[in-house]
From Swiss-Prot:
Main location: membrane
Pfam families: Glycos_transf_4
Organism, as annotated: Saccharolobus solfataricus (strain ATCC 35092 / DSM 1617 / JCM 11322 / P2)
Transmembrane segments: 5-25, 46-66, 76-96, 102-122, 123-143, 160-180, 186-206, 222-242, 295-315
UniProt name for this protein: Putative UDP-N-acetylglucosamine--dolichyl-phosphate N-acetylglucosaminephosphotransferase
Signal peptide: none
Any one GO cellular component localisation term in the record: plasma membrane
Family affiliation: Belongs to the glycosyltransferase 4 family.
Localization terms from the record: Cell membrane
Alphabetized CDD domains for the sequence: GT_GPT_archaea
UniProt EC number: 2.7.8.15
The organism's taxonomic lineage, starting at the top: Archaea, Thermoproteota, Thermoprotei, Sulfolobales, Sulfolobaceae
The keyword Glycosyltransferase is assigned to this record: yes
GO biological process, one term: cell wall organization
PANTHER family: PHOSPHO-N-ACETYLMURAMOYL-PENTAPEPTIDE-TRANSFERASE, UNDECAPRENYL-PHOSPHATE ALPHA-N-ACETYLGLUCOSAMINYL 1-PHOSPHATE TRANSFERASE
Length: 322
């Protein structure tokens, strides 16, 4: 039964994500819902809203978890609803270009399902301080704050083919490993993370260099919120904090530009990326190390996140409540 609970969701997630992404590419081209790939010399137009494929695959796989693991009836609906709410807000942003000042605080509303289902635990084990019980403040402050940070921060470090999706796979892999080596809600959160990994992996086939589709804000907000929701639901707070260290750096770099900075680079005649101004992003710091192809910049950043993922797995010190 446990093997079925693992295999069925990941197979469904991958298959549904794949076929939905193919459909979205076709429909986006027909409706001219496209954006320019700035990091290419010829600036080709690429279909947007690829996040719809990711979401479809994840939801299909997660619902299958409800059929194979009846103990997850509280964790899975909370994670699905929170992620869907933030995805809807991202879709509105893609279509109507919501003001940044408004967009930054919209994820607060997406935290409501996590609060209603009372996922997570108010006792958080903090390195060097030990367990601290935040009581009611955990639900009215920490959960909304955490989901707002994870979704907004993840959306900042994007702009290169496959970058955000690959980072998401690495972060979710760490959470999945932690979850699947524990029991109770942490194990269930690990199953959800595993389903998300395969949904993202199917999408990465089309989003990797050279990209055939972009995730859009609907995709990046969804991935960020999903990572946050899984970390909260599975009591993996320490791991979540460590995994987001690169995004803290990205936030600081963007803050220096009043959040007007970009993550893409400039392209030379050979198709290599460079940046000759003050860095607005971690991508620019990598570009200043040498002139790399776009996929090389992405691989370097993936490698950096992989290091933090290993550290997160090693240092995870959550209090597991079954």
């Amino acid at each position: 039964m446990r093997i079925l609970a693992i295999l069925l969701p990941i197979l469904i997630s991958f298959f549904i994500s794949y076929i939905t992404t193919v459909w979205v590419i076709r429909q986006a081209k027909k409706s001219r819902f496209v954006g320019k790939d700035i990091n290419k010399p010829d600036k080709p137009e690429i279909p947007l809203l690829g996040g719809i494929g990711i979401i479809a695959g994840f939801i299909a796989g997660s619902f299958s978890l409800l059929l194979t693991d009846v103990r997850s009836e509280r964790v899975i609906p909370a994670v699905i609803l929170s992620s869907l709410l933030i995805a809807f807000l991202g879709l509105l942003d893609d279509i109507f270009n919501v003001r940044q000042s408004v967009r930054a605080f919209l994820p607060i509303f997406a935290s409501v399902p996590l609060i209603v289902y009372s996922v997570g635990h108010s006792i958080i084990s903090i390195p060097f301080l030990g367990p601290i019980n935040f009581g009611i403040f955990y639900y009215i402050i920490i959960i909304p704050f955490a989901l707002t940070i994870t979704s907004n921060a993840f959306n900042m470090l994007e702009g290169l083919n496959g970058l955000g999706v690959g980072m998401g796979i690495i972060m979710l892999s760490a959470l999945a490993y932690i979850g699947l080596t524990h029991t109770g809600p942490t194990y269930q959160a690990g199953l959800i993370a595993l389903s998300a990994i395969f949904s993202l992996s199917a999408f990465l086939i089309f989003n990797k260099y050279p990209a055939k589709i972009f995730p859009g804000n609907v995709g990046t907000y969804f991935i960020g919120a999903l990572i946050g929701a899984i970390g909260i639901a599975g009591f993996m707070y320490t791991a979540l904090a460590i995994l987001y260290i690169p995004y803290v750096v990205e936030f600081i770099l963007k803050l220096r530009t009043n959040f007007k900075g970009v993550s893409f680079g400039k392209v030379d005649s050979s198709g290599r990326l460079y940046w000759d101004e003050k860095p607005h992003s971690l991508t620019h710091i990598v570009m200043k190390m040498g002139r790399f192809k776009e996929y090389q910049v992405v691989i370097i950043l993936w490698g950096m996140e992989a290091i933090f993922a290993v550290i997160a797995v090693i240092l995870q010190t959550t209090t597991i409540v079954i």
